[in-house]
């Protein structure tokens, strides 16, 4: 019973310490050509937040094979971080205001049509801040 109570009260403790987290997710994009960048819709906090980002977790799902050379970045208004896989965490946004929206940016280098097209099914971020 004590463990359950502790789990229920944990979010209140975190907020009292001035820390928190927000998450957002969205539909992905379709990229038909190499050498062209495509950006997701902005992902942002649904409630007012203050403070700076500490740790950001990301996840995206592709609908089909990963094209050779795929470059994926997660960008705030002030900086971008290269992502090394379909999910992970980064401290690359440390000290960026937690209120800034994030966007995924996809690009496959080269030229010509992508066959099959790159289809991003979904993308998600969880932003921890203090």
From Swiss-Prot:
Query: Which InterPro entries does its entry note?
Result: FlhE
Q: What does this protein do?
A: Not essential for flagellar formation and function.
Signal peptide annotation: 1-16
| GO biological processes | bacterial-type flagellum organization
Pfam families given for it? FlhE
Task: Identify this protein by name.
Answer: Flagellar protein FlhE
Keyword field: Bacterial flagellum biogenesis, Signal
